[in-house]
């Protein structure tokens, strides 16, 4: 047998490889390759740790680049600059050919609930239909939240982290919803361990958000993402996927992003996203910086 990732290679490349092994039966190797890549080596995990430290250092400087009167895209550009100066490579790699974005997204107000054709937790309209995702020149307004969600590619391995900022004070509902997301993170961190199925972690998050009364705003409003986490690695969307009916079990060495988020209409997104590594006993956070809503001034 000869294995090739048929959903990654172009037809021309696929046919060329098949021609090199005329006696072999070419089969789709994507599932095997993705399964192998879902468990990282100690060297790879160390790369994630270093990336997480650099990512956090950039995020800690975000309040210093805010200026009153900014739009979301102006704010995004300044944050991207912080990331690049910290060593970010500035490229966001994804699996497959149907999803693309620059370095991530900065979403504020109702743009956070804008439907997207991409499989993101939150989409955004973007600057043009040619790339429908992220900031759309929305002014940063008093009483609205801003979610910064940039992929941290500092050494080829993609960290993922989201933090929330506010322009002035937010309605109390937003702070309550943000705490619900932190509670989901804490609950999942307490039960996640090798052997637990991804669907159990997703169902646990849904139970918490339903009990809190935010199910209709969880992971979006009109278009709600049906996952709360995803594997990360050389690409931002690797296995495992924390989603309903996913029987795959966590294994030591897996690295994933957990991102419970809620969108409050008229206010914007709240929630949290961190990168985690599965250990022999549970999971360990790789992206560490302030998780509360930070007021900008």
Q: Where do the PLM segments sit?
A:
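A short, charged helix-loop
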Residues: 20, 24-43
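Single conserved hydrophobic/aromatic residue that forms the stacking wall/gate
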Residues: 1-5, 9
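Amphipathic alpha-helix from the class-I
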Residues: 42, 183-193
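Active-site cores enriched in adjacent His and Asp/Glu residues with nearby glycine-rich loops
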Residues: 55-144, 191-233
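Charged, cofactor-coupling segments
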Residues: 139-186, 234-297
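Short, aromatic/basic amphipathic alpha-helical patches
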Residues: 11-22
């Amino acid at each position: 047998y000869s294995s090739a990732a048929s959903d990654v290679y172009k037809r021309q490349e696929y046919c060329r490889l098949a021609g090199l092994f005329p006696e072999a039966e070419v089969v789709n190797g994507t599932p095997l390759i993705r399964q192998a890549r879902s468990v990282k080596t100690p060297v790879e995990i160390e790369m994630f740790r270093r990336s997480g430290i650099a990512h956090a250092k950039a995020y800690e400087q975000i309040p210093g680049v805010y200026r009153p009167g900014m739009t979301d895209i102006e704010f995004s550009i300044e944050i991207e600059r912080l990331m690049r100066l910290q060593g970010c490579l500035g490229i966001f790699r994804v699996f497959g050919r149907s999803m693309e974005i620059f370095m991530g997204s900065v979403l504020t107000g109702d743009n956070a609930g804008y439907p997207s054709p991409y499989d993101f937790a939150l989409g955004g309209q973007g600057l043009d239909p040619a790339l429908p995702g992220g900031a759309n020149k929305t002014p940063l307004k008093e009483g609205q939240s801003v979610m910064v969600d940039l992929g941290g590619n500092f050494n080829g391995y993609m960290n993922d982290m989201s933090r929330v900022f506010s322009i002035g004070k937010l309605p109390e509902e937003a702070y309550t919803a943000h705490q619900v997301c932190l509670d989901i993170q804490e609950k999942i961190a307490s039960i996640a361990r090798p052997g637990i199925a991804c669907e159990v972690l997703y169902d646990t998050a849904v139970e918490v958000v339903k009990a809190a009364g935010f199910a209709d705003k969880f992971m979006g409003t009109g278009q709600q993402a049906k996952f709360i986490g995803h594997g990360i690695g050389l690409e931002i969307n690797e296995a495992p996927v924390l989603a309903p009916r996913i029987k795959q079990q966590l294994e030591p060495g897996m690295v994933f992003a957990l991102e419970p988020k809620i969108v409050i209409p008229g206010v914007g997104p709240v929630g949290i996203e961190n990168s985690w590594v599965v250990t022999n006993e549970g999971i360990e956070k790789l992206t560490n910086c302030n998780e509360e809503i930070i007021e900008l001034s």
